[in-house]
Amino acid sequence: MTQYLDFEKPLAEIEGKAEELRALARANEEMDVAEEAAALDAKAAKLLDELYRDLTPWRKCQVARHPERPHCRDYVDALFTEYTPLAGDRNFADDLAVMGGLARFNDRPVMVIGHEKGSDTKSRIAHNFGMARPEGYRKAVRLIEMAGRFGLPVVTLVDTAGAYPGKGAEERGQSEAIARSTEMCLRAGVPLVSVIIGEGGSGGAVAFATANRVAMLEHSIYSVISPEGCASILWKNAEKMREAAEALRLTAQDLLKLGVVDRVIPEPRGGAHRDKTAAMEAVRGAIAAMLKELDGKSAEALIKDRRKKFLDIGSKGLAA
């Protein structure tokens, strides 16, 4: 059953009526509701286009967080073959908020790493809602180092509200672990490409997205802080999240103009959660294109390219 966001309530009513008609027809074979159902479907499609044509930043936040949106596990299953998971940071524990391992992408060996939020209550708790602890970032460092030894490109899939801010995480060196992961991304001598598939929250996202090429799905977000957190700090009122979302310029379209990301991946009508297969195939195309752009570059050129990319952030688009 589709979960509707608050701004999709009119759409829910129309699609609900269409489904009721079809249910009646299934119960009574003599009923012919094809024409009425088709009319409702057309009306719903038109409304869906109108709703998603010009989403506000806050509505994009809602879409990026949609519980039915495809997660890292879905992308790995759909886009990669021969996936062999690698666990643990060889220091403390295995953080299930971060998944990663060896795989093939379009028959090319790669290292894939990403945040996994989970898909139901039990798995979300197990994966800590995609909020990594220090051992998760240290696992990523280990896997990127391994990729460097074997000359494997690294693909990262970012989807996190941010690094976990718990007491234990802080005691085990959360900020240092994030910094080490970012440093490892900057000095890896192999191609590194990143896709923000949902939420890109603060340093927890940057630690995986310090890449040669960064792409964002059309309705994903990437920001130094959540709109709710920003509103609580600036206005002492989390209800100001809409204003905060506008000010943060966290949408893929804004960040492309600012030079923070390199490309925006179009999503199916109504968001990635409405057609997961199409969304994941669009991501496949973007990853393939980004890897192709980096083919043939030396380790020195890749490192120089990556460092320049991030040193240049803030040099354009701010006056717009």
Swiss-Prot record:
PROSITE patterns noted in UniProt: COA_CT_CTER
Predominant location category: cytoplasm
Nucleotide-binding as UniProt keyword: yes
EC number: 2.1.3.15
Keywords: ATP-binding, Cytoplasm, Fatty acid biosynthesis, Fatty acid metabolism, Lipid biosynthesis, Lipid metabolism, Nucleotide-binding, Transferase
InterPro entries in alphabetical order: Acetyl_CoA_COase_a_su (IPR001095), ClpP/crotonase-like_dom_sf (IPR029045), COA_CT_C (IPR011763)
PANTHER family, A to Z: ACETYL-COENZYME A CARBOXYLASE CARBOXYL TRANSFERASE SUBUNIT ALPHA, ACETYL-COENZYME A CARBOXYLASE CARBOXYL TRANSFERASE SUBUNIT ALPHA, CHLOROPLASTIC
Complex and partners: Acetyl-CoA carboxylase is a heterohexamer composed of biotin carboxyl carrier protein (AccB), biotin carboxylase (AccC) and two subunits each of ACCase subunit alpha (AccA) and ACCase subunit beta (AccD).
UniProt name for this protein: Acetyl-coenzyme A carboxylase carboxyl transferase subunit alpha
Name of the gene encoding the protein in the UniProt record: accA
